Amino acid sequence: GVGRAAAAAAAVAVPLAGGQEGSPGGGRRGSRGTTMVKKRKGRVVIDSDTEDSGSDENLDQELPSLAKRKRSDSEEKEPPVSQPAASSDSETSDSDDEWTFGSNKNKKKGKARKIEKKGTMKKQANKTASSGSSDKDSSAESSAPEEGEVSDSDSNSSSSSSDSDSSSEDEEFHDGYGEDLMGDEEDRARLEQMTEKEREQELFNRIEKREVLKRRFEIKKKLKTAKKKEKKEKKKKQEEEQEKKKLTQIQESQVTSHNKERRSKRDEKLDKKSQAMEELKAEREKRKNRTVELLAKKQPLKTSEVYSDDEEEEEDDKSSEKSDRSSRTSSSDEEEEKEEIPPKSQPVSLPEELNRVRLSRHKLERWCHMPFFAKTVTGCFVRIGIGNHNSKPVYRVAEITGVVETAKVYQLGGTRTNKGLQLRHGNDQRVFRLEFVSNQEFTESEFMKWKEAMFSAGMQLPTLDEINKKELSIKEALNYKFNDQDIEEIVKEKERFRKAPPNYAMKKTQLLKEKAMAEDLGDQDKAKQIQDQLNELEERAEALDRQRTKNISAISYINQRNREWNIVESEKALVAESHNMKNQQMDPFTRRQCKPTIVSNSRDPAVQAAILAQLNAKYGSGVLPDAPKEMSKGQGKDKDLNSKSASDLSEDLFKVHDFDVKIDL
């Protein structure tokens, strides 16, 4: 009876759990059904236990069944160890999902899983209690999952969580509700059952919750992007550091190989010197033995042998002394090199380090006349132009080994100088003018080219200590304080290379004063030198004057020539015009130059007589009583009277023009 009751309880529990998973809206009913089944199953198990314990008759029969129970319990206790962890994980994930998107669905799935697990636990307990179960019970147990197994829903949820983690950056914010702040149909039905106030309050709470979740989602997204950027930057920094380390390792290996080569060469030189010393010692011992043998025999020696031996001994002594000196100097040089190169000093490895002691053309232009120029410049580096290649300028890194004076005086910016720099690039040395120095910094390719030249020449690179010292000397030169003597030297240096003095008159007066003082002191040589300077100054002034007035005189000559030519041409034009006027016919439309003459002042006697006759006929003969007498007399005798009468008539213009004209039409 107990076995049948347990089987029936298990059969009731399984469909209830399946209904819980399948129906989205039947959460409460499913949970109630499962709790009722649990209570009934518990009661059945307890009753069966009490009945089994109370009956003493079937103890012998139940002993083997108890052994089977222990075995099955020991087998089934091992897998459930992982089950609580999974359930706890699901519970924590569910609790976290309440603050993330898709929380309602996960809750329902979690409840369904819990109900399934409880049902299976109780089924297996009933299975162990009842030893003689039927085939139906075994089929039901085989259909349900065991405690150690993971269901498909769990695996799907784990895979979906991993996918959500991987694609969390691409996902958009979703809190389980739509744009109208409502969920599925069940949620809509529940909101419809509420009052309007409760519904508004619920929607307001959901809005606040959505804002909080949005902020958290954006913060997480920003943090993830920031972490990604940091990782990328760290990777870049690590790659750059690795590249720098590789470069330094390569340079160190080159330096070490170079040092090994130098040491091997020094060892070879020392071996050669030691061999030569041993040979000299052996020769001396042989000569000593010879002299001892000769003295023992007491034979007279020839002069040639004696002198030749002495000369040879002297030569040998000199050669031995020279070899000793050379060995001492070489050893002293090695000791000095060892002292100069401390163990902590490192050679230059970057162009930025060498740029600290680089001199530009602007600095050289400022310092070329300074008293500290040669001392400060030696040991510094410059970027010198050596020519063009494929129409592009080529530059090299070179070290300044000295300052010399060239034969050519050239223009350097605003000053003139004849100084040149003795530069060294590897084994090559050459003198360059200051105007070929560049103002730009060293490039990486130029720096590597210089290093290769130094290594091939077997020369050592400058150390950082030397660069620091030279940098300090450059700073001291920039902050140099001049005294009176320095200023006088600078002025003399600048005057040496000036083509002409700034003021010829002042220079001439100064030279004349110096000449007068020299003549007073009786120094004729100095007076002669000053006179030569004066003559040279006069020649320069005359040359400048000629050069200045050269263009002016040429222009004035051209102007005078043009004036003379214009005069000649104008005279020719006047002659031609007068000739044309004579031969030209009268043209009434041409304008002519003429002066107007008054009709009354005309000198024609016939016209004048006609006018007088008309006037007498009109106004009577008493108007002009003297007219016939004047007409009868000669024109030359009575000019004054005639002019007076004419002037009287001309004055009364109204009378002159007061006459009638008859026109017949």
Curated annotation (Swiss-Prot):
Localization: Nucleus, Nucleoplasm
All copies of domain Plus3, residue ranges: 348-479
Q: Could you tell me which SMART domains the record lists for this protein? A: Plus3
Record GO cellular component, one term? Cdc73/Paf1 complex
Q: Which GO terms describe its molecular function?
A: RNA polymerase II C-terminal domain phosphoserine binding; single-stranded DNA binding
Q: Where is the composition biased (Gly residues)?
A: 19-28
Which Pfam families is this protein grouped with?
A: Plus-3
Give me the stretches of Low complexity compositional bias.
Answer: 1-14, 153-165
Tell whether Transcription is among the UniProt keywords. yes
The record's annotation in InterPro entries points to: Plus-3_dom (IPR004343), Plus3-like_sf (IPR036128)
- Region (Disordered) residue spans: 1-208, 223-352, 622-647
Query: Which ranges are annotated Basic residues under compositional bias?
Result: 105-125, 223-235
Q: Where is the composition biased (Acidic residues)?
A: 48-60, 307-318
Q: What does this protein do?
A: Component of the PAF1 complex (PAF1C) which has multiple functions during transcription by RNA polymerase II and is implicated in regulation of development and maintenance of embryonic stem cell pluripotency. PAF1C associates with RNA polymerase II through interaction with POLR2A CTD non-phosphorylated and 'Ser-2'- and 'Ser-5'-phosphorylated forms and is involved in transcriptional elongation, acting both independently and synergistically with TCEA1 and in cooperation with the DSIF complex and HTATSF1. PAF1C is required for transcription of Hox and Wnt target genes.
The record's subunit annotation is: Component of the PAF1 complex, which consists of CDC73, PAF1, LEO1, CTR9, RTF1 and WDR61. The PAF1 complex interacts with PHF5A.
Q: What is this protein called?
A: RNA polymerase-associated protein RTF1 homolog
Q: Which organism is it from?
A: Pongo abelii (Sumatran orangutan)
Q: Which gene does this sequence derive from?
A: RTF1
